[in-house]
Amino acid sequence: MDLAYLPSPSTGVLHLGPIPLRAYAFCIILGVFAAVWLGNRRWVARGGKQGVIADVTLWAVPFGLVGGRLYHVFTSPDAYFGERGEPVRALYVWEGGLGIWGAIALGAVGAWIGCRRHRIPLPAFADAVAPGIVLAQAIGRWGNWFNQELYGRPTTLPWGLEIDRAHRPAGTLDIATYHPTFLYESLWNIGVAALILWAAKRFPLGHGRTFALYVAAYTVGRFGTEYLRIDEAHTFLGLRLNNWTSVLVFLGAVACLVVSAHRHPGIENVARLQGAGADGRTDDPRPADASVGLASGPPGNSTPRRATESWNVRNRS
């Protein structure tokens, strides 16, 4: 008998009065709101306009949901198109199954459309929302807890997650507790968000480098949690497909960090970028100050004015 363990919820449905709501969907919605809130604070702290982050998010989220679902279905086709699969269930997003890589890839397309409409560069937007995205992932992982899915190998550790017999793998029906990989990844993602906010205050992480830092840091943790998972997945050379994806994406993110730092040192002046066009670029060579991190509110008029005066001096010289 296990003396200590983490229990699983008895149901995956929350009731808001008479309205039933899938807990998985609720976690996603809550994560989106958190991402918009934090992204807006960072954008405004750098001189950006209120509402821009929310407007662009209205484009990014639908694209991201479609991309995340497509990635999940394409990488786990047997569950929907196999011998016992039900193709129509590929549309049941509320039951769980969103691949982060597909969500980021197609979500970026939606964000690009939104950024074009507001005439701002996509990298500047991505840098602003990077810690919010990983915070949203931390919240969204709790949807897996409600669904009793994507857990890890059996374990006898005190924090092992108890899984109902109906949700256990066929080969381990008599084993009750498993690694709570949802919790591991959620805690890791909170740490990544904190790392980004800290780094943004101390280094000039502009031109997409903040977003690249998020991707690189996230993939390290994802590789570890993916290694513990036991749900069915395609493998290559002994590693799950998502492990290989993590390795490739990590290398790409590190390359982006290095190349961007060499070609575009400094950070964009968001106040001047708005309205200058999606291809406009104005750099501030100084490291980002505290206002680029988790600022307490909108900036005063002094920050944009100092940046403009500095730009004028450089042009007169």
Curated annotation (Swiss-Prot):
Binding site for a 1,2-diacyl-sn-glycero-3-phospho-(1'-sn-glycerol): 141
Keyword presence, Lipid biosynthesis: no
Protein name: Phosphatidylglycerol--prolipoprotein diacylglyceryl transferase 2
InterPro entries listed in its UniProt record: Lgt (IPR001640)
E.C. code: 2.5.1.145
Entry keyword Cell division: no
Membrane topology: Multi-pass membrane protein
Lineage top rank: taxon: Bacteria
A Gene Ontology term for the protein's cellular component: plasma membrane
Location relative to the cell: Cell membrane
Keyword vocabulary terms for this entry: Cell membrane, Membrane, Transferase, Transmembrane, Transmembrane helix
Family: Belongs to the Lgt family.
Pathway where it operates: Protein modification; lipoprotein biosynthesis (diacylglyceryl transfer)
Protein task: Catalyzes the transfer of the diacylglyceryl group from phosphatidylglycerol to the sulfhydryl group of the N-terminal cysteine of a prolipoprotein, the first step in the formation of mature lipoproteins.
Composition bias, Polar residues: 299-317
Gene Ontology biological process terms, A to Z: lipoprotein biosynthetic process
Region (Disordered): 275-317
GO molecular function: phosphatidylglycerol-prolipoprotein diacylglyceryl transferase activity
